[in-house]
Amino acid sequence: MIKRIVMMEGGVETLSYFSHQMAQEFQMLGYAVFFYDLKQEESSAGKLRKFIRPRETVLVTFNFQGLEKEAGVYREGIGYLWDTYHIPCYNIAADHPYFYDDRLKDLPEKYRHISIDRRQKAYFEEFYPEYVSRGFLPLAGTGLRQAEEEGEAEPLEARAQGAAVETGEAGAQGAAEQAAPCYDVILTGNYTKLSFFEPYINWINEEYAAFYREIIDDLLEHPACTVEEVALAHCEREMGKKPNDQLRIALHKMIFIDLYVRNYWRGKAVRTLVNAGIPVHVVGKGWEELEDVRHPECLKLHPQTDSVTCLGMLADAKVSLNVMPWFKDGAHDRVFNSILNGAVCVTDPSCYLEEELHEGEGVCYVALQDMDALPEKVKDLLQNDSGRNEIVRRGRAIVEQKHTWAQRAKTLAAWIAEDAAQ
């Protein structure tokens, strides 16, 4: 019977945050949870060995943390500690498998791959049949109130009072004013200018560059398609049918195409609003390099920050802008975080997202190819406080019930118990 769960911290901040959110629920379910610190491997390794009980322990991780032959869990000639103690390894891959082709090898015997998008799951099962595909588990959200209860965020009231003191305002009225949403539109996420990708497009020769540009142009013209759908069609047309082991390497070498189209549409969404005179607060790196901005005074720059601070900023926003990172049958945590913290999420749709949240249930959908409609949709939301609040209310009821990290932990705990019983 599984009673103990190992998780990872000290790597990518957002992944550590997701892990701690899930750990809260795992502990509520009766599991003992140990966090292995990737920044303190020497001290963590000894504690990890004391924590492990063979056949009672599993690893739950994101993005192959703890599965990259880290010194504390892997030794040359011996292998992974996970294999030594017969530990199942559940890895939630927070992006497409083609980003991880170089990591999808030499993995522990009991590796279990979890996909956050149903089409990504299908791709993994076709191109990596040597590994177990455990299922589809989309990303989830956290409400700031939940973070407050867990001691991870300053209470809303305290933030409001602090702001009132800093600005010289006193009393309940000043605090209430500061607590009201102060960002009309916000986007939390980084931006990379498109010229950054030119060396990758041109890295072989002109013939390959033309091939890559054809794929990019096809994706920009047909944004409902996945990168693999378009890229594989072009590969077959140019080179004929190739074995999957060759194609998966080819797709891995084209990940810059995925990043190009993500940033193209993310930049276009922000630019469209800013050029329409709508102020947009962007939280993350790279936005000072956004091209073709006609109203720079409407582009409000904020530095990249941690997860809890982002949640606080969402709680202070009316509208949260999202462009899906090419998840065509999954969801991004930005969508759920926005709704849980009181902002309407204006986003492009995905098949899964439209099943879970209908129009007006926390979200307003704008197809990428209909970007010209974005300013009017956002203006309508900003001008209708009661309507906007009703959209959030309807969405929050659904998200609180189905799309928190606690719910994801419960699903994963059921899978772990099911696997252990076999």
Named regions from a protein language model:
Residues 3, 31, 57, 87, ...:
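A structural micro-motif
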Residues 35-37, 90-92, 112-116, 136-137, ...:
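Short, hydrophobic beta-strand segments that form beta-sheet elements in well-ordered domains
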Residues 4-8, 15-126, 143-148, 152, ...:
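Extended catalytic core of nucleotide-activated donor transferases of GT-like folds
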Residues 73-90, 200-213, 334-343:
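A short, gly/pro- and small-residue-rich
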Residues 2, 9-18, 128-157, 174-328, ...:
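Nucleotide-sugar donor-binding catalytic core of glycosyltransferases
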Residues 7-11, 17-29, 34-41, 106-108, ...:
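Catalytic binding pocket for nucleotide-activated donors in carbohydrate/polymer assembly enzymes
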Residues 151, 162, 168-174:
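Residue-identity detector for glycine
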